[in-house]
């Protein structure tokens, strides 16, 4: 997002969370799965991890993702900088939440 100058769950090329997660290999051999995502950025003091987490917890949909009992795994990414503000001191955060039920692997 920072490099391409956008801030959204879907990138300029139309790739969304499911596309990105499929590309990571997380869903290989998976029977069922569920995903969620929170994104945020801040400039200056509001860019600290504490400030971002407080903002997410104060937002009903973001808080729901964080506390959702169905999610069992999380991936967290932090990149220096803010989308569309190349000279600003800040950070951009993504948390991807997931749960999956894997296919059993046949033993030889």
Where are these regions (language model features)?
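A well-ordered secondary-structure block
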Residues: 16-102
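Composition-driven, intrinsically disordered low-complexity tracts enriched in small residues
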Residues: 106-108
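Secreted/periplasmic proteins that engage bacterial cell-wall peptidoglycan
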Residues: 1-24
């Amino acid at each position: 997002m920072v490099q391409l100058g956008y801030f959204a769950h879907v990138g300029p090329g139309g790739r969304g969370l499911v596309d990105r997660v499929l590309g990571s290999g997380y869903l290989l051999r998976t029977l069922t799965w569920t995903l969620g995502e929170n994104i945020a950025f801040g400039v200056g003091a509001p860019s600290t991890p504490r400030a971002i987490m407080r903002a997410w917890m104060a937002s009903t949909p973001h808080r729901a993702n964080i506390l959702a009992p169905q999610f069992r795994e999380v991936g967290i990414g932090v990149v220096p900088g803010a989308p569309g503000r190349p000279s600003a001191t800040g950070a951009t955060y993504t948390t991807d939440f997931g749960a999956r039920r894997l296919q059993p692997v046949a033993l030889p």
